[in-house]
Structure formats: C-alpha cells, structure tokens
Amino acid sequence: YELPIDPSKYRRRGLAVNLTRLLYRCPSCGTQEGLKLVRPYSTNRVECSSCFSAWVIDATCRLASVDENGQDEGNWAPLPDYYSRILAMPLIPIRTELRIGMEQGEELYLISRPRFLFKQEQFPNLRVLAFGRAFLTSRRLIFRTRLGIPLAAPLAGIGALSVDPGDKLHFTHEGKLYRIPFRNESALKWFDTIRRLQQAARRGQKG
C-alpha cells in the first residue's frame, strides 16, 4: 500500500499525486473516481467532487480528514485502513444506454473511458486488438468497439489478474494474455471489482 515518493515529482505535484489510483472511491460517500487533487498540489489534499469531503496525506502515507478551513482534524490513519474501507463498501450496479448484449439478470458495474485493448497471440508480442470501451458486468468482462464486441470473457474464465505500473490491467482468457492501459483511471478499481464479483459468483451471491 506504500505509494512511491519521488522528491522531484512531489515538489511539483504534491504527495497526493498517486492517491486516487488506490482510493478509487470516496471513503465517505463511495462515489467512484470521486476524489480529485486539490490545487495547489503542495497542499497534499484530495477532495470528493460529490460530497466535498477532503483529506490530507503526509510523507508516511497517513491520511486525516480536513475541515472547512483546510486544517487536518487530527484523526490520522494509515492508508491501508482507508483502502480496506473501500473494499468493504457494497458494489452498486449502474445503467448504460449502450448495447452490449446483456442477458436477463446480468448487472453492469463499471464502464471505462475509451481504451486500447492489447492481446498476446504469440509470446512476447502484445499487439493492439481493438479500441473501445470496457464494460464489467456481474458475469462478463466485455470490450465494445464501434464495429462490434471483440471480447466477452466470462468472469469464471478470467485469470492471472495483475496491475502493473502505469495503471495497466493484465489478465488471461482462453490461454491468451490481454492488457488494458487505464490512463487517468484506476486500474485497481477494475482489478478489485473483478475479484469481488468472481468471489461472489463462487459463493452464489451478489458483489
């Protein structure tokens, strides 16, 4: 859970620069991708664009909530505690007007911004397979382009999930390796949600 701290970077962008990669939901209201960096970045603060709760982070990766005057309230807690709070939040289905061939009883949880989808046909080459949006449902990881759906992977068949530096999500399906770079979006959000839905499916429950 430790964030890499590069002195040359945090002087320009503050200690909170990578915080939203891990805290992809507001710890207070649960809004997805709700936390935004507060300017100037030297304040080392993030604020929720939905409920306006704010936090400050220090060099030891501890956070404290911030009052309306921008002062910490003294309730410092380690970053892993906040991450655990997010993992304990229930998954909330969302809606879309885009047609992705959802089946009866299938629920949608995540939609990405436009992304590239890479596929490894032969080791070690990863090549661009498509450009479109990723959709995560209670049953499948779907990638939709303007021309169709090149990938509709059942969650039970997705394995080897990992997140690499640069917010790249890797996974395998039917013996092939795939990669989706999630620039300016938390890849960990996708990793955690896929894992939670897989675990819920094995238990016969919702996420």
PLM features: what roles do these ranges have?
Residues I5, I57, I86, I92-I94, ...:
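Weak global preference for isoleucine
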Residues Y1-P90, T172-H173, L177-G207:
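Non-catalytic C-terminal accessory region of glycerolipid acyltransferases
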Residues Y24, V46, L108, A134, ...:
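A broad, low-specificity signal marking well-ordered, structured residues that form hydrophobic/aromatic
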Residues S65-R133:
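Anionic N-terminal interaction surfaces
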Residues K119-E185:
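Phosphoinositide-binding peripheral membrane targeting modules
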